Regions:
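Mature-region segments of soluble proteins
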Residues: 34, 38-41, 50, 57-165
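N-terminal secretory signal peptides and thylakoid transit peptides that target proteins
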Residues: 1-12
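Onset of an N-terminal alpha helix
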Residues: 3, 28-37
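Bacterial Sec-dependent signal peptides at the C-terminal "C-region" and cleavage site
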Residues: 17-29
Length: 165
């Protein structure tokens, strides 16, 4: 791992952790989210016409929503499991350049149905981060909406999560 990548990963993880609700911070294992962040950056890299994952806050979104009680716990468990599966498949994935990461991710998806399902689930949540209301922690600066030229419906949410009684 080079120094620049380490610093960027640490800043990204620290920022994401700081955005979590105070009572959920003790229950978050940040290691899988470093892998998830790298995969999201591979799926939505810089230099495309679409916003890149770091620009629209894909990992921050997933950290925020997965810490809420309404998040499907089996999804969180599978997301963490898949991150471990990927690192076991390619232990140098986090230190690869973007081209090698893309190739490794394609090989990983082809290696098993679990790997394919994991990437599909992660893509689902990444697209949700791109297109959801910014109040939920993704779609930073409405980048996803602006990219698609989308006009939002009204009224927009005022609270992050509905109050369940």
């Amino acid at each position: 791992m080079n120094r620049r990548f380490f610093i960027l990963a640490t800043i990204g993880a620290g920022t994401a952790l700081a955005l979590l609700p105070q009572n959920s911070k003790t229950h978050i294992d940040i290691a899988p989210f470093k892998v998830i962040e790298a995969v999201q950056q591979t799926l939505f890299p810089k230099n495309l016409k679409a916003p890149c994952a770091s620009q629209f806050g894909a990992t921050n979104y997933l950290l925020l929503v997965s810490s809420h009680s309404s998040f499907v716990k089996s999804d969180l468990k599978f997301l963490k499991y898949g991150a471990d599966l990927l690192i076991n498949y390619k232990n140098d994935f986090l230190t690869m350049n973007s081209k090698d990461r893309d190739e490794a991710l394609r090989d990983f998806v082809d290696s098993s149905s679990k790997a394919e399902n994991w990437v599909a689930l992660l893509l689902f949540y990444t697209l949700e981060a791109l297109l959801s209301d910014p109040i939920y922690g993704g779609n930073r600066n409405e980048l996803g909406w602006r990219w698609l030229n989308h006009n939002t419906g009204q009224p927009q949410p005022k609270l992050k999560f509905a109050q369940i009684e």
